[in-house]
């Protein structure tokens, strides 16, 4: 009974808090540090990020989508869709119908992005709201004829400080107000490719810089008076795994390059056959024991990577740490793109703000779950998506959430309370029961004679 009262009272308080703050427009800043592997948090020191986490929430592993590349996963974060659904299926793509090509240097055609509606477009279309972006993939493209009110054209030479200055200026002073903003930074991905994630000396230096940037971000938000009312999510698109020159898969040793066109290379190679598809497949399937070769229709269902015309007829997937090359060596000591079930491919998520609990840790969510959570925070109606809002409820202060250990504890506690109450009721009933009054045995008149003569 006491437990029920407490739960009801907590619900009323939560509801009151939610209602009392509803007059303030919710604001959300989404930050991505490209290639931030989840276990970097355990293997390196991050004083600024750990302070951020102590005052907010941490999701230790975010299971991203296959293929675990930059453009596809950044679009999954903001649409809640698998790659086959939102259409950005790789960093390099080819559309057989239009004959168009997509790459990181040729990504401005809305054709590639229009199969989905990212959250900044949905937010931008609301009354008295606007969106802002500092180089998040796709934000400098007019998607469904809509672009953010404030954005920066992508230029990797622009410093983090300049990007941060613009984003905080737009969040602090714009009309209509910026209620959703994104900020993207290329590290630690670039250094992860160069050194490999197991290079402690170099990665320690790089990750310290990342932590300092997070400290700068928090300090700037506090200085501008944005910190207490702004929801901030820090996450990434993928992790990184160690590669080496002795783990190469040379396609030229297996098949003549004139038999196919290579759309995307490693570690997931997209093959467009120029001759009979089956013949190309048969030549490739025995190329290496460290590479899986799939016809498009045979790609495992768990990848959600079949139902899009931009996915090529044959897909090659290298084992973790192996690199697919064309008769040449690889300069990369780190890479990503591999099977999304691998922990090395997973990023993390940390969040702080009025929408989030404080000091809460959660083991895992899916990257597509971030989108419905962000829509909830901003009060937006989400477009159809592959995410599950229930997976993120435990992170949010306005949601009642219970996990399995807590459920077991509540059941056991409830049974103990009920048992104690039952015992108390029985004891009280026994104490309060009225005893029968004492009375002498009444004898009949003829019973006055003695029984023994």
Swiss-Prot record:
GO MF annotation list: bis(5'-adenosyl)-triphosphatase activity; metal ion binding
For this UniProt entry, which residues form the secretion signal?
Answer: 1-15
Q: Identify the residues that bind substrate.
A: 91, 154, 189
Active site, renumbered: 70
Which residues are on the Cytoplasmic side of the membrane? 429-453
Under which main EC class is this enzyme filed? hydrolase
Q: Which residues are glycosylated?
A: 155, 166, 276, 386
Q: Which reaction does it catalyse?
A: P(1),P(3)-bis(5'-adenosyl) triphosphate + H2O = AMP + ADP + 2 H(+)
> Membrane-spanning regions, if any?
408-428
Question: Could you tell me which cysteines form disulfide bridges?
Answer: 254-287, 394-401
User: Which residues does the annotation say bind Zn(2+) 2?
Assistant: 189, 193, 336
Give the note describing cofactor binding and stoichiometry.
Binds 2 Zn(2+) ions per subunit.
The GO annotation for biological process reads: blood coagulation; positive regulation of blood coagulation; purine ribonucleoside catabolic process
Keyword terms of this UniProt record: Blood coagulation, Cell membrane, Disulfide bond, Glycoprotein, Hemostasis, Hydrolase, Membrane, Metal-binding, Signal, Transmembrane, Transmembrane helix, Zinc
So which tissues is this one expressed in?
A: Expressed on the surface of vascular endothelia.
Q: Which residues lie on this side of the membrane: Extracellular?
A: 16-407
The function of this protein is: Hydrolyzes extracellular Ap3A into AMP and ADP, and Ap4A into AMP and ATP. Ap3A and Ap4A are diadenosine polyphosphates thought to induce proliferation of vascular smooth muscle cells. Acts as a procoagulant, mediating platelet aggregation at the site of nascent thrombus via release of ADP from Ap3A and activation of ADP receptors.
Q: Give the protein name, as stated in the record.
A: Bis(5'-adenosyl)-triphosphatase ENPP4
Gene that this polypeptide is encoded by: ENPP4
């Amino acid at each position: 009974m006491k437990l029920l009262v407490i739960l009801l009272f907590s619900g009323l308080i939560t509801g009151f808090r939610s209602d009392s703050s509803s007059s303030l427009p919710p604001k959300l800043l989404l930050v991505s540090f490209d290639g931030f592997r989840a276990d970097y948090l355990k293997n390196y020191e991050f004083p600024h990020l750990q302070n951020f986490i102590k005052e907010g929430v941490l999701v230790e592993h975010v299971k991203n989508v296959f293929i675990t590349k930059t453009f596809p996963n950044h679009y999954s974060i903001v649409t809640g869709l698998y790659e086959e659904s939102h259409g950005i299926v790789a960093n390099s793509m080819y559309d057989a119908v239009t004959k168009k090509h997509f790459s990181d240097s040729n990504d401005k055609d809305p054709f590639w992005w229009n199969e989905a509606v990212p959250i900044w477009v949905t937010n931008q279309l609301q009354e008295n709201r606007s969106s802002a972006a500092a180089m998040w993939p796709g934000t400098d493209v007019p998607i469904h004829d809509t672009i953010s009110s404030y954005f920066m054209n992508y230029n990797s030479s622009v410093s983090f400080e300049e990007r941060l200055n613009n984003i905080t200026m737009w969040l602090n002073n714009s009309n209509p107000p910026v209620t959703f903003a994104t900020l993207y930074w290329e590290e630690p991905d670039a250094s992860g490719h160069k050194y490999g994630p197991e290079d402690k000396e170099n990665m320690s230096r790089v990750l310290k810089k990342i932590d300092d940037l997070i400290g700068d971000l928090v300090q700037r938000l506090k200085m501008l008076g944005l910190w207490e009312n702004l929801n901030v999510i820090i996450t990434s698109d993928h992790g990184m795994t160690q590669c080496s020159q002795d783990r190469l898969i040379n396609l030229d040793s297996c098949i003549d390059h004139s038999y196919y066109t290579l759309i995307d290379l490693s570690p997931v190679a997209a093959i467009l056959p120029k001759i009979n598809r089956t013949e190309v497949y048969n030549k490739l399937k025995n190329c290496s024991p460290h590479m899986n070769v799939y016809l498009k229709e045979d790609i495992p269902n768990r990848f959600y990577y079949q139902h899009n015309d931009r996915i090529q007829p044959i897909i090659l997937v290298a084992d973790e740490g192996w690199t697919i090359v064309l008769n040449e060596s690889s300069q990369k000591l780190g890479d990503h793109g591999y099977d999304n079930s691998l922990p090395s491919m997973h990023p993390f998520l940390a969040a702080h703000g009025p929408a989030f609990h404080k000091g809460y840790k959660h083991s895992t969510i899916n990257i597509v779950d971030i989108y419905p959570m962000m829509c909830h925070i901003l009060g937006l109606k989400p477009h159809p998506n592959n995410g599950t809002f229930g997976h993120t409820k435990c992170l949010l202060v306005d949601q009642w959430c219970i996990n399995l250990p807590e459920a077991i504890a509540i059941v056991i506690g409830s049974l103990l309370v009920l048992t104690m109450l039952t015992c108390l009721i029985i004891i009280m009933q026994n104490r309060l029961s009225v005893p029968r009054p004492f009375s002498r045995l009444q004898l009949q008149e003829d019973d006055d004679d003695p029984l023994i003569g």
